[in-house]
């Protein structure tokens, strides 16, 4: 839709986001992703609840035709020794440049409890770090977004799919 669903969300208290990085059968172009970020930001600033869920593993493009309603099932799944921290930092940074008071985030390796699911019933250490309130909205410079919080500086480059979070330790009294 021309407004990316902002008019439709008025009928609800919020929205559940998945397919955030995909468009049709392909990984979203940087322009489409930038537009999605802008829409998320607008809805979140207007007070809508936004729940964003994203997959940690790569898209499995070797499967040919995919069922676009099953994006979780078309991911490769994390390998036994695969380090997913780089991807988690990217996804969490992407979320943080958009998030407001009623925004929620889940990064997963599928919605199953198989023994090969590396993140089932785990909690990333980043979730326990103090973030604090945002110092303002994200600043966009091309395809790079930055945002500061009381205890973190976030930078995400959607063109290169790189996210960085610099954690700032709170001062002790």
Where are these regions (language model features)?
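Glycan-processing catalytic domains of CAZymes
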Residues: 1-173
